[in-house]
A protein has these predicted regions:
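Polybasic, low-complexity RNA-engagement segments
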Residues: 1-152
Length: 152
């Protein structure tokens, strides 16, 4: 698993700095690797010649021809390190999003990825397009969050 190339690292870090307001100095302390069009943050680079089905670390982003998509998991871990592009939802809005619905979002953020937040907790990645918010959160995590909402 190769370390992330300098141009790719610059592009991934630019997403988190420019879109989400994460401090570039923090991102510079992380070790980044790329495998199968995925960008991972790891505590140590794997030894040369060692391959794993999955890298030991956190998947931070996916590389698509259309651009870079941050993962819900990494946004959750960044939490309060993000200062921009956050959609603070209430419980009924969160339920709608988790059920796969889009909701009206008049907040004025530019189209693109946002961190979905309920109170102080970042719950995952959202997409804002033409004043509508959706949540491409993984199915397992959606079910987990819906279950928690029903229990409260």
């Amino acid at each position: 698993m190769p370390a992330l190339s300098d141009p790719a690292r610059a592009a991934v870090c630019a997403l988190f700095v420019d879109r989400f307001g994460v401090d570039a100095r923090f991102l510079a302390t992380l070790r980044w690797i790329e495998t199968n069009q995925e960008v991972w943050v790891v505590s140590e680079l794997p030894p040369a010649g060692v391959t794993h089905v999955r890298p030991p670390g956190i998947r931070a982003a996916r590389l698509h021809p259309s651009g870079i998509k941050p993962t819900s998991h990494f946004l959750t871990l960044l939490g309060n390190r993000m200062t921009r592009s956050q959609a603070a939802v209430n419980r009924p809005q969160l339920r709608q999003l988790l059920l796969g619905q889009r909701i009206a979002w008049p907040d004025g953020d530019a189209d693109g990825f946002v961190a979905i937040r309920l109170a102080d907790d970042v719950l995952g990645c959202g997409v804002l397009r033409r004043g509508r918010l959706s949540a491409p959160i993984p199915t397992g995590r959606r079910r987990e969050l819906l279950s928690i909402l029903e229990d409260v």
